[in-house]
């Protein structure tokens, strides 16, 4: 245990040294603060001033000409022509300058501002009122602005980055986990760290339970921490925080639940390793997320945002639905409804199948996006699978990934039974063959006795 902890500390120190070496060739402010904060130019002494640049201010700002405000405002109502019956008079009027104030043949009507009531309420007489602005939109269409703004907030999220603008991934950007070298390196390392035990857990199941629980629970916690930290921190800070917390959990994953969470002191799972409970709940939330995305497609989310009119509240509702479904599946797994052996086999097979498929899908997506410029990616890895925008949808590639997960899970459960059935058939054939040999030997012995008798 001490050796493992020492090795994990060595790994963390090595990663920190690597980051410091990288920062020598990169801008630290860009890496850590998305270039929004500068340590070295914080004081006002480093700010550039116009008078220090020796630039004439007239090149920076050009003043506007004098404008006849009455003509400008009356243009909103239109111009009322009077006494222009001859075409020559009209041509003369067109050659006038806007700065002229003595215009005898033009009536300038007083401009009256629309009030709030007449602007938003439906009023059929608005268009007939000469005192209101002509050319304004129909108030009926203005009433739908609230709905349009809500739809804009949904499709084009409040965040400044354009990559959050699609509720369904349409391939107009490369997701962050495929575009940032730190995230690619970190996720690839974690998959490499667990890939061997994933295949062993898929084939052998509970016979490799100790190492499986230790590493796979750490992998699930890694994705949870990374998903949360990317919301609040830049990529490199998220990687550092995620590594520290992940390897801390690695050191306590085999501890009993009662030593970590005192709420489990009187429950039936108090002696179970905390890592095993994490794996069982991860399996529950994976299935729960599939059910949630089936019950709540993007059209349902649009209905939610239209009537709730609060994007954050909609996210909380969606998260509550996922957690509710997941807790139902979790309590179903730890109850006595299913035999414990079958439930354990299903957890091993399903979690192994999901992580194996997500591992290959992640590297395949990198190859598609970075080398083939193809955006038909699989949204099955945890970061994209549990995403509000872009949302997981049941398109062809995602349906194929889900089919592979469930097919591998069923095959992992059925394969040992088929193997056992073949072994039983082989044993039966051996027993029949051995019995035939015994009968042949007995008959031969009897024949020898008869021959000896005659001799």
UniProtKB/Swiss-Prot annotation:
Topology relative to the membrane = Multi-pass membrane protein
Give the UniProt subcellular location, in the record's own words. Cell projection, Cilium, Flagellum; Cell membrane
The protein, known as: Membrane protein Pbs54
One cellular-component annotation, GO: plasma membrane
Provide the phenotype resulting from gene inactivation.
Gene deletion results in fertilization defects affecting both male and female gametes. Fewer zygotes formed and ookinetes developed. Lower infection prevalence and fewer oocysts per midgut in Anopheles stephensi mosquitoes after infectious blood meal. Does not affect asexual erythrocytic cycle. Does not affect virulence in mice. Does not affect gametocytemia and sex ratio (female/male). Does not affect gametogenesis.
This protein's superkingdom?
Answer: Eukaryota
Q: Which residues cross the membrane?
A: 12-32, 181-201, 220-240, 244-264, 285-305, 312-332, 346-366, 398-418
| Claim: Transcription regulation is one of the keywords in the record | no
UniProt keyword annotations, A-Z = Cell membrane, Cell projection, Cilium, Flagellum, Glycoprotein, Membrane, Transmembrane, Transmembrane helix
What is this protein's function? Answer: Plays a role in gamete fertilization. Required for the successful transmission of parasites to mosquito.
Q: Which residues are glycosylated?
A: 41, 102, 125, 373
């Amino acid at each position: 245990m001490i050796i493992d902890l020492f090795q994990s500390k060595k790994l963390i120190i090595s990663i920190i040294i690597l980051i410091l070496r990288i920062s020598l060739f990169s801008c630290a402010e860009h890496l850590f603060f998305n270039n929004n904060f500068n340590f070295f130019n914080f004081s006002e002494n480093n700010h550039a001033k116009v008078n220090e640049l020796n630039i004439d201010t007239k090149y920076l700002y050009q003043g506007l000409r004098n404008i006849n405000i009455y003509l400008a405002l009356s243009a909103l109502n239109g111009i009322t022509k009077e006494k222009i019956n001859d075409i020559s008079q009209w041509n003369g009027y067109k050659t006038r300058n806007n700065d002229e104030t003595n215009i005898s043949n033009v009536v300038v009507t007083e401009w009256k501002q629309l009030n709030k009531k007449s602007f938003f309420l439906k009023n059929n007489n608005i268009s007939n009122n000469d005192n209101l602005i002509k050319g304004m939109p129909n108030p009926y269409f203005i009433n739908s602005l609230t709905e349009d703004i809500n739809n804009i907030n949904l499709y084009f999220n409040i965040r400044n980055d354009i990559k959050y603008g699609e509720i369904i991934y349409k391939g107009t950007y490369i997701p962050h986990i495929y575009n940032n070298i730190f995230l690619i390196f970190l996720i690839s390392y974690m998959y490499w760290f667990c890939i061997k035990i994933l295949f062993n857990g898929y084939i052998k199941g509970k016979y490799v339970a100790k190492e499986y629980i230790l590493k796979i629970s750490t992998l699930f916690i890694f994705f949870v921490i990374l998903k949360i930290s990317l919301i609040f921190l830049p990529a490199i800070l998220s990687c550092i925080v995620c590594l520290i917390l992940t390897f801390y959990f690695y050191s306590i994953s085999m501890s009993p639940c009662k030593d970590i969470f005192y709420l489990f002191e009187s429950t039936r799972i108090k002696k179970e390793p905390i890592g095993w409970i994490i794996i069982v709940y991860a399996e529950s939330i994976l299935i729960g997320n599939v059910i949630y995305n089936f019950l709540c497609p993007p059209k349902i989310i649009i209905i939610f945002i239209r009537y709730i009119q609060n994007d954050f509240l909609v996210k909380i509702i969606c998260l509550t639905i996922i957690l509710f479904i997941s807790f139902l599946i979790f309590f179903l797994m730890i109850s006595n409804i299913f035999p414990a052996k079958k439930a354990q086999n299903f957890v091993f097979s399903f979690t192994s199948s999901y992580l194996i498929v997500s591992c290959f899908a992640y590297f395949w997506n990198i190859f598609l996006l970075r080398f083939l410029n193809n955006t038909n990616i699989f949204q099955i890895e945890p970061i994209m699978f549990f995403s509000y925008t872009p949302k997981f949808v049941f398109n062809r590639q995602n349906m194929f990934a889900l089919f592979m997960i469930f097919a591998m899970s069923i095959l992992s459960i059925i394969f040992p039974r088929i193997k056992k059935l073949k072994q039983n058939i082989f044993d039966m054939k051996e027993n029949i063959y051995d019995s035939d040999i015994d009968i042949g030997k007995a008959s031969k012995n009897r024949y020898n006795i008869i021959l000896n008798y005659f001799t």
